[in-house]
Amino acid sequence: VNGERPSLASYLQSLGYETVATHPYYATGWNRDKVYPWLGFEQSIFKDQYYGARFVRDYVSDPSCADKIIRLYEQKEEGRPLFVFNVTMQNHGGYDQTYTNFSPGISVDGVNSISVSQYFSLIKLSDQALEQLIDYFSGADEKTVIVFFGDHQPSDTVAAPILAMNGMQWNALDEEQQKLRYQVPYVIWANYDIDEEQNADTSANYLGAEVLKRAGVPTDAYQNFLLT
């Protein structure tokens, strides 16, 4: 991306939304400090603006990201809807080192792996951050939608022991098993009634349009095309 591009952010901005991108790491990573404005984000927030954040391993924790989202909501312009796109860092690999600020507390029976223990312990913190957001916005006066998803599965250092427990080898998966390694779960939650569905497969390029539809936000011609 080397210039302005239409995106979910620019579309929501055209509808009057305040648009904020936040990523608790370095602004120059993937040129985010340039790309986010090109995509229609009015404000970009990076690691140096996470004042007082709790660090887990080398990264800002997911609960601190939840705190940031809540503060952005509380400080937003009154009467103007808010769109926040938050890319977390807490669970970034690798998982085979020890840290003074994080002690894994979850293990898997039959697996002796620091990577597995660390990864699942980090996921527990992510669950707590999601719970924190849902608890807060359940009581919010404004209609709110939370979309929660990952960009990829953990590395083979985590997956291999789990696969082995199920009689599979990470480097000898058949085509269908390999496809499963490229799937991630997602959640769309709202503090008001929306159409409910479980185990609905989709692709990331369709997710934005799907969220707009379920949230009751008007969609444009391109988004309608994605939804057909």
What are these model-predicted stretches?
Residues 1-228:
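Solvent-exposed soluble domains appended to multi-pass membrane proteins
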